[in-house]
Amino acid sequence: MSGHHPIVDALAARPPWEPARLTRALARLSGTIRSVSATIDPTERRWHELVAQSLATAEGDHRPPLWVVLGDSTAQGIGASSIDHGWVSRLHAALHDAGRPYAIVNLSRSGAHSTHVIDEQLPLLDHLPYAASIVTICVGGNDLVANPYAPRLTRRLERLAEAAPRGSILCTL
């Protein structure tokens, strides 16, 4: 996958997912959490492949509108029965069926906090071949689990809203 595009290279350079302490503890107690956790790395690798395909298409003669997805496991589709059943894939299929095909560039990462989106995911938008038509950002659950102190969480999400491209769709918990 390396060598195709700066975004693809950045995704390939990410270290493997490491579960948070709470996730590790819950996985010891729950087979369901253990099995969902086992899908995280394969799902992320599949998104990387799809991003590479979308960027290759976007750099060709046909330039479909770009939909960039940022965020955490909700944007990855973790917990769905397959990558095709996550909300991003389902909405992408519905748009395609309605005659509005988009190239998806899913830069999300399971376990991401709002600061990860700001510091790691948003800067990758500078490497898109052209401006995204849609940017969706779904994050907040991991922020809440890590530090539920409301004023701090509110400041983080306000900072994210300020850093996001104009017209982004931000969904948080």
Task: Annotate each language-model stretch with its function.
Residues 75-76, 111-114, 141-144:
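Solvent-exposed loop/turn segments at secondary-structure junctions
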Residues 78-83, 116, 147-151:
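Short, solvent-exposed loop/turn segments at secondary-structure boundaries
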Residues 119-173:
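Alpha-helical cap/lid subdomain in secreted, periplasmic
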Residues 99-113:
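A short beta-strand-loop structural module common to alpha/beta enzyme folds
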Residues 84-97:
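Short catalytic helix/loop segments, enriched in acidic residues and glycine
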Residues 1-69, 77-81, 96-100, 130-131:
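N-terminal secretory targeting modules
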Residues 66-68, 105, 135-137:
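Conserved beta-strand elements of the Class I
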